[in-house]
Amino acid sequence: MKSATTGTRGMFTSDRGMNNFNNRMFTFFVWGISACIILFICALLYLILQKGLPSLTWDFIMGLPSEMEEGGGIGPALFNSFYMLLISLLIAVPLGMMAGIYLAEFAPENKVISFVRICVEGLASVPSIIFGLFGIALFVEMFQVGLTIIGGAVSLAFLNLPVMTRVTEEAIRAVPQDMKQASFALGATHLQTIRRALIPTAVSGIVTGICLVAGRAFGESAVIILTAGVTTSGEMWDFNLLSPGETLAVHLWYVQSEAIVPDAVSISDKSAAVLVFIILMFNILFRIPLWIKERKSR
Amino acid sequence: MQLETSVQSLKMGTEESELGGSIKAGSGRMLDRKNRLLFYNRSFKIACIASASFVCLVLFSILFFMFRTGVLTFRDVPMATFFFSTDWSPENESYGAFVFIFGTFALTLLTLLISVPLSIIIAVFMAEVAPKWMRNLLRPVLDLLVGIPSVVYGFLGLTILIPLLRNITGTNMGDGILAAAIVLTIMVLPTISRISDDAISVVPRKYRDASYALGATRFQTIFKVTIPAARSGIMYGVILGMARAIGETMAVVMVIGNTPQLADALFKPTSVLTSNIVMQISNVPFDSTWNNALYMMGFLLLVISLLMIVLVRLLQQKGAHR
Amino acid sequence: MKLFKTLSVAAMAIALVATSITGSTASAASSLKGKIVVNGSSALLPLTLQAANEFKKLNPKVKISASAAGSITGPQSVRKGIADIGAVDWDASQDVPGFKKFDGQVAHKVAVIPFAAVVNKNVTADNLTTKQLQDIFSGKVKNWKDVGGEDADIIVVNRAFGSGTRVNFQMKALQGTDFISKGDNYKEVKSSGDMKTAVETTPNAIGYMDLVYVTSKMKAVKINNIAPTEANVINGTYKVWGYGYYMTKGEPDGAVKAFIEYIQSSKFQNGSLKKLKFIPISAIK
């Protein structure tokens, strides 16, 4: 670049024509690459949804899986997915939020707390298979309960805990100081301030976090294969926490790997479509209230 | 405490006094309310501290469990053999994990080589170039990509990507670190680009204005002002993406070939730490050296990802001091 | 932790109520009670689940929880007392290549599982001798032209160590010779499904799997001029098959015994078991 040698004239004043060319090239380039990637993503989503969605029936979604005949459903696996997601969220969201609130609001700035932060981030980066191994060590070897829903759900909760913590902390930190001070000035206690001012303001970030966590938990397979097994109890609406807890993502894996039903390919296509569709719904459903809220506050 | 007891005695006193009931009740409730609020505040804070400690506890118990089982490996296998030998054939009692350690690093590096430039371009596009409606559409779509189960990615890799690679390059198999890196790129792309996008978006408006005022084009502004200013945020995204690439299991295992040999070519079937663990963990006897060695590999993975976090922290501190 | 305890108690209470409602509607055909936990081989899982469904209809008070991780987890779980039945693809009361025997466990044959060597559709060779198979899987023969095919590299696809299919194939088809463990044209897969996809989509590939999984998109080769068919297994000419076993700690009793007896009954063996494309144990002389 010529500009580097002509120091006094500043770093940007080089050959104007060249710059314009570069700029156009750059814009073109960025648009091009982005368009390619976006097209690719859309093609990917289309590929998954188009293979499965058109042939979806209610019987498939609610039906019991079959081991030898065509037409088995995914009912119990789908139910387990939601059930385990719910349990893991029940554990991870309150704990994660409180830990996040602590880090954002109460924690003093010292070595111990920065160590705690490293722990949270460290836990967030732990590979999911490690949570699976940990789940085996904890539930299969220590408590000897075998492969169960509760084992899977707790392992999932551990997986989600740090993400929840971090997201809450960030969201609460992003709330303007004025808001907090105004609340204190009105005589509110710290808890009241957190409940009535901080959390409602930070809810958008927190909900995005829950959304992220729920999506991840819903699609997770390695942890669940190791801790909750690859089978269901074969009954619909089985709330027993000690039943084996195959989820839809695991069922997808199982059907591709071991099942000998003749329509395994179509089951896995449909399961994949259902999975992606549900995650899509999570994203939309969680966001709609936020959009409405945003509109209102405007 | 002293205050509370005095309040109590005061209340006791008023019980028998001649004062009107309304005052008595009123003051009582006031004080109750204060105590109650104090109590709620305290217990809430304690609950918060407990939750934060719980998160740390989980990490340490994971570290402890993995280490406790993993370290038993070294009863039967010398440490140097485990870390530096390339011979992994547990059925003949050789436990050299170097192939997997090397594979993990090679795969991660290759993934980053492909995904970082692409992600940054996408991030720049979303934050600086794209019109607002497109941005609002793109962000949820990228978030959605994070949620697609890795099994699905793996299956698409196995059925679409590998035959494609085989046809393009004319190799025999197509399995190997290149295939795995491409699949991983798709998986970490949303993570890196979303975080970089956020980092670029929060670069203060005035930086850009100043740059434009000096006569810079958009290209120059982005590359010389915006991206350097967002550097630490982008680094954070890259390292998170890296952590995901290192830890990904189900997608990698389907396309990497799972052969314990050194990944010295793009299309050579090889194996990484995660894929080897998941391939073998359910097929080894409990309490065997083999099982312990797999846990040791898990512990290694854990240490690698923790080191990376410490790296992020250092980077962030450097960013803050700047 | 306390939260999770209360939660689990609450959920269990709900589950109890739910099961008592559904339980009362089913006819009390049998007085058999208990809980059976099955763990182990994933290849036997479809069989176990199907049998469990039918058995539960006959004995509504028996709860069966079946799961699978890998063959070796079956007898291991039994030894640890986590499972009552360990499903395994080989007789775990004996030593097999790679695995020691489990003392004090009783093996019950439940099915005959035929295995087939399969190749991609583009492979022209359709008959392999035991010697040729041994050479291919041990890496001595690297090109299809040496075993009667076209001039192309052989891609060997193998199951991961510890797979029951691998143990059986090694014992019955390769007569105990070792597999290669590395090479440019060698890969390992995690499951029967992955094996299927790999052989279907990789030209010049050879692998092996339970006969059940063989599809029209691949080719099952003859071994020593004998086609891998059910009939050939039954008449004793095709040798590459193994029994599926249920391992129990000592002789079983109660519900576990009844369940194993149900699986071994001719009604199940000639009904669902056949439909699942396993071969009844009584068919083998």
Regions inferred by a protein language model and the residue ranges of each:
Chain A
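Generic hydrophobic transmembrane alpha-helix motif, especially the helices
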Residues: 121-157
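Transmembrane alpha-helices
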Residues: 190-228
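C-terminal transmembrane helix and the adjacent membrane-cytosol boundary/short C-terminal tail
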Residues: 169, 173, 211, 250-298
